[in-house]
Amino acid sequence: MHLHEYQAKDLLSSYDIAIPPYRIVSSVEEGELVLRELGINAGVVKVQVHAGGRGKNGGVIIAKSSSEILAAIGKLLKMRFESNQTSGESLPVEKVLITPLVNIASEYYLAVIMDRKNRCPAIMLSKAGGMDIEEVAQKYPDQLLTVPLTPSARIYNYQLRQIIKFMNWEGDTGKQGVQLIKKLVQCFYDNDASLLEINPLVLTQEEELLVLDAKVTIDDNALYRHPKLEVLYDPSQENVRDVLAKKIGLSYIALDGDIGCLVNGAGLAMSTLDILKIHGGSAANFLDVGGSATEQQIQEAVSLVLSDENVEVLFINIFGGIMDCSAVASGLVAVMQTRENLIPTVVRLEGTNVELGKEIVQRSGIPCQFTDSLNEGARLAVALSKQV
């Protein structure tokens, strides 16, 4: 689950991490009150959306007067934000963040991440802050440092010394850096985060380390342990089908292809996506209905996949160990019989009650093609998608 910037800053503030004053407003009138409260006549106004690239895509405005701040608030609240991280969709802007300008001497990148390569949490740092970390890694690899962490949420003194030396933090700045890193690591572990990113972290001309921007992602599977974080979920920032899938308890991720997939089991679902790609096709979604889905859940799953206007072909790939193939068939038929425009459908059923499942579909008269092979089913689905 992604947090908005202001929510991330709220979380970091609870760990006594230094952040410039900030306020959230949802109208120009609220902005006028905040300006008086903060006592500022210049500042930065930033859209609050679950996407990066805000500065490059008009989502951040530096204002040098009170009137410019108010104009920026009005402008940003009217926009729908889009960047290369929004998958072609535009996100609503319901709130903007106001914060004063600071006198920046140096900018840095600092994050606590899940290091997939080494299978452990890690601290990632760079002396080139304010840039996309992917760009830093590509252009300035010598300016990037990754420090692995232990499962016990400890960071050792020798690692802290390594970091301070790499970042060229001396004297009091080094002491601030040590305390900041310790607090960030603790925050990461305490809240089951999968990402805690500060970009930029700045050293001001007054020699104070400050967090100017923050991004936090919480592990969805751990939210039951964090009810105070769970309520921060903002469905307006998610794909509508992702939101619906969460409500009905399905594992769904929207993708960019045109072949809708309904599969049971995460491993089989990922294999299905891979084999479609091998045959030259592209999936419109990842959808794992699990091993014990009911007929009603299958109906909801089929409807969910077909609600995507990009779906040209439906590929159902079920290996029924616990799953009852007849329930899958009945759910599919129930949805298809209510639709006027049917799309080509490829069905691969194997396992419990497979013959009954095939009979249910065949009796219904809905147009679909059966296959007993995953490879053949994927090839057929791709071929049909290219004919549409």
UniProtKB/Swiss-Prot annotation:
What's a Pfam family in this record?
A: Ligase_CoA
Q: What is its EC number?
A: 6.2.1.5
Gene coding for it: sucC
Alphabetically ordered keywords of this record:
ATP-binding, Ligase, Magnesium, Metal-binding, Nucleotide-binding, Tricarboxylic acid cycle
Listed under subunit, the entry gives:
Heterotetramer of two alpha and two beta subunits.
Q: What is this protein called?
A: Succinate--CoA ligase [ADP-forming] subunit beta
Question: Which residues does the record give as Mg(2+) binding sites?
Answer: N199, D213
Output a single Gene Ontology CC term carried by this record.
succinate-CoA ligase complex
User: Would the keyword Metal-binding turn up in this protein's UniProt record?
Assistant: yes
Functional pathway: Carbohydrate metabolism; tricarboxylic acid cycle; succinate from succinyl-CoA (ligase route): step 1/1
Task: Quote the record's binding site residues for substrate.
Answer: N264, G321, I322, M323
**Alphabetical list of InterPro entries matching this protein:** ATP-grasp, ATP-grasp_succ-CoA_synth-type, ATP_grasp_subdomain_1, Succ-CoA_synthase_bsu_CS, SUCC_ACL_C, Succ_CoA_ligase-like_bsu, Succinyl-CoA_synth-like
Describe the reaction catalysed, as an equation: succinate + ATP + CoA = succinyl-CoA + ADP + phosphate; GTP + succinate + CoA = succinyl-CoA + GDP + phosphate
The prosthetic group or cofactor this protein requires is: Mg(2+)
In its UniProt entry, the species of origin is given as: Chlamydia felis (strain Fe/C-56) (Chlamydophila felis)
GO molecular function terms here?
ATP binding; magnesium ion binding; succinate-CoA ligase (ADP-forming) activity; succinate-CoA ligase (GDP-forming) activity
Q: Which domain of life is it from?
A: Bacteria
Identify the PANTHER family for this entry. SUCCINATE--COA LIGASE [GDP-FORMING] SUBUNIT BETA, MITOCHONDRIAL, SUCCINYL-COA SYNTHETASE BETA CHAIN
Say which enzyme class the record assigns: ligase
Q: Name one GO biological process term.
A: succinyl-CoA metabolic process
Question: Which residues are listed for ATP binding in this entry?
Answer: K46, G53, R54, G55, V102, E107
Task: Please state which protein family the record places this protein in.
Answer: Belongs to the succinate/malate CoA ligase beta subunit family.
The note on the cofactor says: Binds 1 Mg(2+) ion per subunit.
